[in-house]
């Protein structure tokens, strides 16, 4: 009876979780070439809003709010990222960097077409610089 139960458990094991969870940290290079100056203003305008937060992208639009994040406006995007998804000064262990840099993984963000290398670089360098707030925001860095 025990062998039958064990066989059934082993056979069902692969049916549980079909995707691995993202790692806590990955290796990233901060000596890459960003497409633009790695400020949050640029990151939001040139990558996040257009790629993840537009009505066409839907995932992190005002309506989509996937993962509880809206990139519909700069303040919401900054608040969402700095509420545990970014470790200022530590891009290797920042959830947003892990997910955007894990090309081909089930947890890659955005799903489908990844961010371009220069966009990922700008994100990595912004986090490395301490994830400073947008230029018009009060309160400075997180």
Label for each model-derived stretch:
Residues 1-17:
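Sec-dependent bacterial lipoprotein signal peptides
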Residues 17-142:
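Aromatic- and Gly/Pro-enriched helix-to-coil junctions and flexible linker segments
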């Amino acid at each position: 009876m025990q062998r039958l139960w064990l066989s059934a458990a082993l056979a069902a094991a692969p049916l549980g979780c079909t995707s691995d969870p993202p790692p806590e940290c990955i290796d990233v290079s901060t000596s890459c070439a960003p497409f633009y100056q790695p400020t949050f203003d640029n990151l939001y305008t040139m990558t996040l809003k257009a790629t993840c937060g537009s009505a066409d992208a839907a995932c992190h639009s005002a309506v989509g709010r996937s993962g509880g994040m809206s990139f519909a406006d700069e303040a919401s995007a900054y608040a969402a990222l700095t509420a545990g998804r970014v470790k200022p000064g530590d891009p290797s262990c920042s959830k947003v960097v892990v997910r955007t840099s894990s090309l081909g993984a089930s947890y890659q963000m955005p799903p489908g077409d990844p961010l371009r290398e220069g966009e990922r670089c700008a994100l990595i360098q912004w986090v490395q610089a301490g994830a400073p707030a947008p230029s018009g925001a009060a309160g400075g860095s997180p």
